[in-house]
Amino acid sequence: MHTKFKEYLEKTNFSKNTVESYYFAIEQFYQQYGDINKRNLKNYKVWLIENYKPKTVNLRLRAINCYLDFINKSELKLTFVKIQQKTYLENVISEADYNYLKNQLKKDDIDWYMIVRFLAATGARVSELIQFKVEHVRLGYIDIYSKGGKLRRIYIPKQLKDEALTWLANRNQDSGFIFLNKYGNRITTRGISGQLKKFAIKYDINPAVVYPHSFRHRFAKNFLEKYNDIALLADLMGHESIETTRIYLRKTSTEQQELVDTLIDW
């Protein structure tokens, strides 16, 4: 039955990671509890809550519920745990640290300077960033289609476009992927994440705030500070719901601390 469930997931266009994650949850349940029944399912949920973060708990429960639908036992489906929404943004690179990193890289490593610039000035996810080609820079945007066929257009601001075209001309590149590794192949998302951590250490910046998605957060924060249109930002970020974008209206924990220190004198 487990194998058939895995085959079902693969045919239903779930991503490889989701298939593996769901299959792992089912294996985990059967190894610990053996039989599918109401009591065992509740015990499994309690065990998950005691051992994992809420986000992981809900991922496992989603897998279990999917499996219960598959075996026609939907009446046993479990409710998800409520995730307390944080009132602040965590681990977002500050404007000062971003500018410092950007300026250091511009002097020391122009290729990595451009990676950081593109991340922060386009709001691209790192998986989207590595798809940029010279042709997209010339156009001033890239169109990316999700698995569901939804179009996401990522714009390249004119200032960045001009800078990138000069950079590409200087290295005599007129086509193909623009972000390459030392072997001349398209760089990987893991390669970007790992090298950014090294730069954080080199330039004495907190490594916790130097990772690809941090620059996407920086893009959103800066955008709202300059142009307070959350609906437009949601479109630019490729968010399905505007509620996802609302997090950027919040302060970072550091900004909250600074405000408290400044405002409260009683």
Predicted feature residues:
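Conserved catalytic core of the tyrosine transesterase superfamily
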Residues: 1-266
